[in-house]
């Protein structure tokens, strides 16, 4: 059967919701019905289409910048983010940062392009989050050799695990005299 909405309209609806932060049920009338847009988004996510689009764009940006399509070094960090009582999903309490909410664990290349992201409860340690972030990454990032990280990632257990999981070397970056790491 023919599609009721062109894929371009569906993509525009998804980008509109992403850009404005509007709830999916509040899409303006010029876009497909929210149920259609959400179903399309969900199907594409489950099929890995968004991941493929992201990878293609990231590789294109790297090549345009004169870099290899896949990086050899990367930077790993985390950030605890407050959530509200109404927000659903995973949450916890990060005692070190005094934050009740979620923690984003990210791996970026030297151009600050996202390689991997994992969202956990805020109470998740950086070392445990790093394992969740990196597991299964080797086939997607075959050239990755070096991961720069800050103090919470130091220690032999993570370094040993990284060496075994992906033959990655973890190098801890010390803060400068100004108190900044990255």
Listing of model-derived features with the role each one plays in the protein:
Residues 1-182:
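Short alpha-helical elements
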